[in-house]
Curated annotation (Swiss-Prot):
GO BP annotation list: heme O biosynthetic process
Name of the coding gene: ctaB
Protein name: Protoheme IX farnesyltransferase
Transmembrane domains' residue ranges: 34-54, 56-76, 119-139, 152-172, 179-199, 225-245, 248-268, 283-303
Location(s) in or outside the cell: Cell inner membrane
Organism: Bradyrhizobium sp. (strain BTAi1 / ATCC BAA-1182)
Amino acid sequence: MSVIDQNAIAVGPRISEADVGDYLALLKPRVMSLVIFTALIGLLIAPGHFHPVLAITSLLCIAVGAGASGALNMALEGDIDSLMSRTANRPIPRGRVTRQEALAFGITLSFFSVLTLGILVNWYAGALLAFTIFFYVVIYTLWLKRWTAQNIVIGGAAGALPPVVAWVAATGSIAPEPLLLFLIIFFWTPPHFWALALFRSDDYARAGVPMLPVVAGPDATRLQILLYTILLVAIAAAPWPLGYFDAVYGVVSLALGAGMLWFAIEVFRKRERSQSLRANRKLFAFSILYLFALFATLGLEAVARMIAPLIW
């Protein structure tokens, strides 16, 4: 990146005109899709009848809140993004959107999502969505990410809250089921992101981000990945014997957990650079499949319970 581009990021001027695609990129669409999916599962497993219009409204508000968090995150991390190859093409490092514009965009969407959810659905869900945005933007982005190697561990709480917000939107209360979903995502986050950090450690080191591989080294990170994966597999399987989720979920969680554990062990075992790189990438890719399949199973079980009375 040129000196001119670096200076542009520091002071925030526009280098070229932004288009709709640039503002969509600020929303972090991939992260939004995961948030929508996990929130949808939170809605589906919630008890009772939730009006479809309110359900759609809740999902949209949660999605917009997640997008707002992404925009604010990019506005506050323009300096970091410009130094990392993975993020250098984002709108702010490219000079397509200024930091001030991203901040205004994110703040506007934050207020819109929280107020709409509170007014149209319930204020418990609105308050929890506001807390989720605050936690991600202030606690994680401004503090944890820049100052501690445990940034992903603690900060993972923000990414784990959407299904809880959805459940509260549907019921107006809290229960063990959404808390179990929270714990699954919370303990899934470290192995997922540390696998990424292992093969992107040079990027993080260059940007001065204290990710675990940068601070503690790859060996310590591999051990932490394995330990968190063991906890994840145990926590994900627990709802079945505890009677919260059905046997189909239990079998799927054990099968997926075996796969997750296998890839984590491979990451722990393989230290040679080329083999380690492949193992890290495989764990990262499988972890996405793991979470999707696990939550999809819950969603399918919930849908089956809904339509069963209509069939029989």
